[in-house]
Amino acid sequence: MKFIDEARIEVIAGDGGDGSASMRREKFVPFGGPDGGDGGRGGSVIAVADRNINTLIDYRYAKKHLARNGENGRGADCYGKGGDDITLRMPVGTTITDMETGELIADLTEHNQSVQIAQGGAGGLGNLHFKSSTNRAPRQKTDGKPGERRMVRLELKVLADVGLLGMPNAGKSTFISSVSNARPKIADYPFTTLAPNLGVVRVGPSRSFVIADIPGLIEGAAEGAGLGHQFLRHLQRTGLLLHIVDLAPFDESVDPVAEAKAIVNELRKYDELLYEKPRWLVLNKLDMVPEDEREARVSAFIEGFGWDGPVFEISALTGQGCENLCYAVFDYIAAHSDAQRAAEAEDLAADVRFRAKPADPVAADDSGVDPQQ
């Protein structure tokens, strides 16, 4: 199936039904009075996150989604039937934005999370609501309200703990296939990866994390060059970025330091927050470097790149160093997840809305004896 991570659709909620201006006409009831019922409400448009859906391809071709209108009210105090809601099922990780106002309507991050994105119109009032002591036979009634109509943009941002960065053919797909069950296409030409790939890395029982591989970046990606700029949004939810560098390029004229700096510059141009995410340096293809040259080549790269963060030396093809890297990544994610939960708990405790009310003092009766003793 083709991977589609963006779509634009129009959602139209149902209109409310009109109220009825009806009079009770019945034998032996000379002054029946008003009996017009209200109109039914219009159907709403609801978005639901579904973990069994992986792409927005259904919305690339179905551009308009309409809910049903409410029925009109009728006589004999009959209210109109409400319009049925429609449900749009989307992948977990989808954001929904109003294209006219720029408002973020919803961010679907959990399975079965539901959000109303277009509200149905309210039904009109029948004339039975307008009777009074001075107006026994009202002819007034109100029409139903129109439902909301919106043009929205759907964007899928995959949910992963770790994202892979690097130039084409740096070995990102080889790495993710080495440490997980993901099987992306691997070949010796650039842009083999055309869509994001997700893999689950297990480091022990109930100990795992999700890693995302996106198409390789090239210089100018933030301005539209290559493919990577289309998929950088998928790294925005990650907690850690692994910058994979090819230390042994086939073309000897290629400078790994210059390529690594180009990747960092593209991150900064695309999104400052993404640039500031924690980033580790992963030097790949060490099996292609003679053993007596490895230390010198690694030191020269780190010095030329001006890097002072964590560095890991691996060979994704042979698996050398991959296990230690995965354990380090899991420990980092687990530690930061615990810290985030603790911070959220502190924020919750500081919120006055959730503070426990102090117990009321126990009043003594006239005899001076505590009634609870």
UniProtKB/Swiss-Prot annotation:
PROSITE patterns: G_OBG (PS51710), GTP1_OBG (PS00905), OBG (PS51883). Its EC number is 3.6.5.-. Monomer. Its cofactor is Mg(2+). An essential GTPase which binds GTP, GDP and possibly (p)ppGpp with moderate affinity, with high nucleotide exchange rates and a fairly low GTP hydrolysis rate. Plays a role in control of the cell cycle, stress response, ribosome biogenesis and in those bacteria that undergo differentiation, in morphogenesis control. Residues 160-334 form the OBG-type G domain. Gene3D superfamilies: GTP1/OBG domain, P-loop containing nucleotide triphosphate hydrolases. GO terms for molecular function: GTP binding; GTPase activity; magnesium ion binding. It is an enzyme of class 3 (hydrolase). One of its GO terms (biological process) is ribosome biogenesis. The gene is obg. HAMAP family: GTPase_Obg. This is GTPase Obg. Mg(2+) binds at S173, T193. Keywords: Cytoplasm, GTP-binding, Hydrolase, Magnesium, Metal-binding, Nucleotide-binding. Belongs to the TRAFAC class OBG-HflX-like GTPase superfamily. OBG GTPase family. GO terms for cellular component: cytoplasm. It holds the Pfam family GTP1_OBG. NCBIfam families: Obg_CgtA, PRK12296.1, PRK12297.1, PRK12299.1. It comes from the Bacteria. It comes from Paraburkholderia xenovorans (strain LB400). Residues 127-147 are annotated as: Disordered. Residues 1-159 form the Obg domain. It is found in: Cytoplasm. GTP binds at residues 166-173, 191-195, 213-216, 284-287, 315-317.
